Swiss-Prot record:
The keyword Magnesium applies. The gene is metK. Homotetramer; dimer of dimers. The lineage of its organism: Bacteria, Bacillati, Cyanobacteriota, Cyanophyceae, Oscillatoriophycideae. Binds 2 divalent ions per subunit. Binds 1 potassium ion per subunit. GO terms for molecular function: ATP binding; magnesium ion binding; methionine adenosyltransferase activity. The keyword Metal-binding applies. CDD domains: S-AdoMet_synt (cd18079). This is S-adenosylmethionine synthase. Keywords: ATP-binding, Cytoplasm, Magnesium, Metal-binding, Nucleotide-binding, One-carbon metabolism, Potassium, Transferase. Its cofactor is Mg(2+); K(+).
Length: 418
């Protein structure tokens, strides 16, 4: 009997209050690592009407102006009009930072393996910055090997921001959210049930002042300029049965930090797989790569994506866990949900041999300390629209560079990954 169900994921635009915070946190991280690649950073940001608070723990030789960094990022996002209750030039920016605890620092600087002379391997030098568990996931539902609901939600959110920034839809404002419900049959996406867009907009649209007319104008424009282009290379598209909801409260004029406060790390499902895969609970933004919440989640995605790209599974989830101050993972788990072409035990053996999951090894493999300096900016660009499946960015953990090894090891034809 065919099982038919809906699965829903959401995304938010860069102007969403929580995403403002994520981006400021990662802008600070970029600036610090660009000057001092060994900076220890845990930058947290809070925003509210007319207010930005930067807090957390930072130990670095870098000299940066946190207030200027915050204002520059806020302006880049699009908050430049004080009449909207939040503006780069008029908001207050408060800074309250401490240094990293020496009790934590000693375990990161010299891992247990080094302290107790258990290993002289250079990659055993750095200990995990905290205990915890991280997940990575991939599936063959989209060209970028991501679940279709979150992939579509991100595409629509990015397009929503693009038509605002280019002036194609000049009445849009920075805050916005998207949501897509995909129809599945026996685990495969077969249709689009509902698309939801909530987008901040001006009080009037030129000569149009009636709210019903405003909402109809926005809805019609979003379908043509945002939704339709977002499905360009996706085989499954909206049809006559697809429900399309826009600003279902009736209007969305008050938005951004004037409408809701924001906080770094509150959009962890948006940042990852839209709820399709499990999540270890740790946020990414504002954290330097010794924090395994971030770096190990990137590594797990790399493992899972290569396994799926190699044709060894339709879906793959990887879990890794750590103890604070210890370099080597406490555990590694691989789950292919019955779609694997080889056993999870064999895949695990391969992963342990060919993928580096110690913090120092992850940092080295993806160049996580030096990449902001080399590219001019880096982490702030993944702080909105997802950290995975980004076809618009060159992300080291998205490379399918282990496919040939996997294919040779298990004699499977590889699939083409975006």
């Amino acid at each position: 009997m065919t099982r038919r169900y809906l699965f829903t994921s959401e995304s938010v635009t860069e102007g969403h209050p929580d995403k403002i915070c994520d981006q400021i946190s990662d802008t600070i991280l970029d600036a610090l690592l660009s000057q001092d690649p060994y900076s220890r950073v845990a930058a947290e940001v809070v925003v509210n009407t007319g207010l930005v608070l930067i807090t957390g723990e930072i130990t670095s030789k870098a000299q940066v102006n946190y207030v200027d960094l915050a204002r520059q990022k806020i302006a880049e996002i699009g908050y430049t009009d004080s009449n909207n209750g939040f503006s780069a030039n008029s908001c207050a920016v408060l800074v309250a930072l401490d240094e990293q605890s020496p009790d934590i620092s000693q375990g990161v600087t010299k891992a247990q393996e080094r302290r107790e002379q258990l290993s002289d391997d250079e990659l055993d030098h750095i200990g995990a910055g905290d205990q915890g568990l991280m997940f990575g996931f991939a599936c063959n539902e989209t060209p970028e090997l991501m679940p279709m609901p979150i992939s579509l939600a991100h595409r629509i959110a990015r397009r929503l921001a693009a038509v605002r920034k280019t002036g194609e839809l000049p009445y849009l404002r920075p805050d916005g959210k998207t949501q897509v419900s995909v129809i599945y049959e026996d685990g495969k996406p077969v249709g689009i049930d509902t698309i939801l867009i909530s987008t901040q907009h001006t009080e009037t649209l030129g000569q149009i002042t009636d709210n019903a007319a405003i909402q109809k104008t926005i809805k019609d424009a979003l379908w043509q300029a945002v939704v339709t282009p977002s499905f360009g290379d996706i085989e499954i598209k909206p049809d006559n049965n697809t429900k399309f909801l826009v600003n279902p409260t009736g209007k969305f004029v008050i938005g951004g930090p004037q409408g809701d406060s924001g906080l770094t790390g509150r959009k962890i499902i948006v940042d990852t797989y839209g709820g399709y895969s499990r999540h270890g609970g740790g946020a990414f933004s504002g954290k330097d790569p010794t924090k395994v919440d971030r770096s190990a989640a990137y590594a797990c995605r790399h493992v899972a994506k290569n396994i799926v790209a190699a044709g060894l599974a339709d879906k793959c989830e990887v879990q890794v866990s750590y103890a604070i101050g210890v370099a080597r993972p406490v555990s590694i788990m691989i789950e292919t949900f019955g779609t694997g072409k080889v056993s999870e035990e064999k895949l695990l053996e391969f992963v342990k041999e060919h993928f580096e999951l110690r913090p120092a090894g992850i940092i080295q493999a993806y160049n996580l300390r030096h990449i902001p300096q080399e590219r001019g900016r880096f982490y702030q660009d993944v702080a909105a629209y997802g950290h995975f499946g980004r076809t618009d960015l060159d992300l080291p953990w998205e490379k399918t560079d282990k496919v040939a090894l996997l294919k040779d090891a298990f004699s499977q034809p590889a699939i083409v990954a975006g």
